[in-house]
Amino acid sequence: AFNSLFPMPNVTINCLNTATTFQVPGGSDLATAYQLSGLQLPNGVVSAKVNNKSEALSYRLYNDKQVEFLDITSGSGLRTYTRSLMFVLARAVEQLYPTARLRFAAILSRGVKCELTWPDADNAITEEMVSNLRIRMQQIIDSDLPFESGRCTTDNAIDMFRALGLEGKARLLESTGSLYTDYCRLGDSVNYFYGSLLQRTSQLKIYDLVKWEDGLLLRIPNPDAPTELMPLMEQPKTAEIFREHHRWQDIMGLTTVGDFNRACAEGRATEIINVAEALQAKKIAHIAEMIAHKPDCRIVLISGPSSSGKTTFSK
């Protein structure tokens, strides 16, 4: 009734995809704006950049904006697609193996490396389990469920995630200092993802789930060929680095950002630094020993991103 008495003015959209401007009713979401734009992305729209910030298609427009609609050929769009797949997998695990703990370990081997563990059983993953999860994922996708968002007080969100066994997310929220928290909902499954999700599960067309080393690999589309999966790539050295990193996290008792924030709040920052330095010194000594056992080695190359400590390491 309020909106009919006081209609919102139209919003002007500067669409970067078409280099044109058009208007939409104030309060429209990005999905509506995409329909009104007349744009037809060949691989379907998954999200958008609004004033250069990634947003879900449920984002509402109340002011004039610069908008670029994205599909899975863009990095941001592919991340939206991948997060949505992760949520579907999390729901499948919750339904089939409610006592299991699913951990998204790393982006590895052209997909998402996942760990599945049980509190009171061995962690052997069988092909039958993988097949069951794959079938359940497809059932969830075929159900065309909406990815919904909700908001509640952070205290309520902490209680909710803790009741669901999502202790890592609960600890993270305890350290944010935010009064309210946004969360994601898929059917009766609740979770928390940092970033946008798709509108509905039926948009997930290309994916696979395979047994990979001691865990699972959630395969995702290839942005260069969106109708195909990313080709599998063996990355043994990278995989070993991640395994070592997780071992170090277990040693220090810091498996999540929430654990780290809590430790810092408890005044353990110096202890954490000292333990990390000791582990790193041991690793450097091991590398030096490997080099010493190669008398014909003439040059050692050190690679890494900007400001990662290459010069300091070389000394």
Q: What residue spans do the PLM features occupy?
A:
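Conserved glycine(s) of the Walker
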Residues: 309
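P-loop (Walker A) phosphate-binding loop of NTP-binding proteins
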Residues: 305
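Hydrophobic anchor at the beta1->P-loop junction of P-loop NTPases
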Residues: 300-302
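Hydrophobic positions on the alpha1 helix immediately C-terminal to the Walker A/P-loop
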Residues: 313
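Ubiquitin-like/PB1-type beta-grasp interaction modules and other compact soluble beta-rich domains
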Residues: 2-86, 90-92, 96-108, 119, ...
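Auxiliary tRNA-acceptor-end handling modules of aminoacyl-tRNA synthetases
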Residues: 44, 59-79, 101-295
